[in-house]
Amino acid sequence: MQFSENTPPGILPCQSIEVLIAGGAIPSDTPLDVDQVQPASLDLRLSDQAWRVRASFLPGSRRVEDRIADVSMHTIDLSGGFVLEKGCVYIARLQERLTLPKGLIARANPKSSTGRVDVFVRLLTDSGARFDDVAEGYDGPLYL
């Protein structure tokens, strides 16, 4: 699958997402579950690592984990589950990462179920200038 400036804009169907996964553009700490691939999206999963931080941030020209070191209150092991405290800010590394080909960008939207439980979620990437947007050719980890 080739992407370029001539590729028409739009949302990728599940078949294209599956090609990206098979081609290594969406590697994961653990194998992807078949039900993660939706008709035009991919459900992402939390890793075992999270941080409670003083405030949300955009990393600017830095790596997310370098910025976390500046504002982290403590590290959280999610392997046994964890209850979020209301009014607190957390950042969690995702199991999936991206190695986007040229000509392809990505955008994240929270699942409606997170809003129903009053959780506000934004995606962060290394050197990201905007929440929820993944730049063309991005190669790196993802965080919520």
How should these model regions be labeled?
Residues 1-143:
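Non-catalytic terminal segments and appended small domains
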